[in-house]
Amino acid sequence: MPSFRPHTPSLVRPGGRARSAGQGESAPVSAAISDCAVYENGSRLSGEFAPAAALQQVREVETGSGKAFVWVALHEPDEGQMQSIADVFGLHHLAVEDAVHAHQRPKLERYDTMLFLVLKTMKYVKDDPAGGSREIVETGEIMIFVGADFVVTVGHGEHSDLAAVRRRLEAAPASLELGPYAVMHTIADHIVDSYLDVTDLIETDIDAMEEEIFSTQAKTDIESIYQLKREVVELRRAVAPLATELQRISGEHDDLVDVEIRRYMRDVLDHTIKASERIASYDELLSSLVEAATGKVAMQQNVDMRKISAWVAIAAAPTALAGIYGMNFENMPGLDWAYAYPTVLVVMAVICLLLYRTFRRNDWL
């Protein structure tokens, strides 16, 4: 399901600059930055900032009476680019390795005064004409580093862009005034809402499959059911662990997360549990549909075998008579009788007709 960059051995070490094995100099960090902005008292400051300059601007604002933080968004950075960001914001090297290599389960980790949250993204792509793949749902990952005055987001996959979330927040200065953890909440809320959207579309697919299976006319495609079940299992692995991690945010870390943000996170937790329960029910329903489809196919095969057997029996009678009278013997009953040939043909036809009527009466034909 996921379509991330291949994993390369990590050379990130505390205090050292990262480099991929077999790789030369890293690309400039600006190549991986989708957006970098400073927010002061709920409003975005004009101008473009490099991460270090943005953090310096925030610290200058904080020495006064204002509240500010920086939000840096990265997309699939390499180890060198990620280490440059880690040097600026003081990110823990273990979290940095996770952010570079992706393929992480949803989790929440605390490093001193910083939280590191991993979320799975989902996008329903079954009816996307440009997709070109057989996937029903594509997944990606978003890693969120949250400190007292910064947010660093790292996206992996085609559907990890947070531009819409940033615009939503910038249109609500009151939310941005709550600080970096408000950004974490809004991102989590956006992603969990997408889970519910995906489950709605999957439910439509399951309803269509259910109608197809129990229809007497439609042909049952077991492969498509297996494919959807495989996708649902992937979704279950992506969503189920998240509820526990969100519960930790809403119930722990009160020294870092404002009480108002923790209230909002409880709402996100409720939606996550709802999505997880839906996906679990879909998994069970698809298991039942697989059994029903298998039974339907087996029953259809039995019907086909009965038809084949009936026609074989009908063909066997004239074949047997023809075989007997086709033997090269001189002394056989009826060889000299003038009406022997038409009589044998009539007997063949009568036997075939009787067999046909018998099989029709027993619903074999």
Regions flagged by a language model, labelled:
Residues 250-262, 286-297:
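Long amphipathic alpha-helical coiled-coil segments
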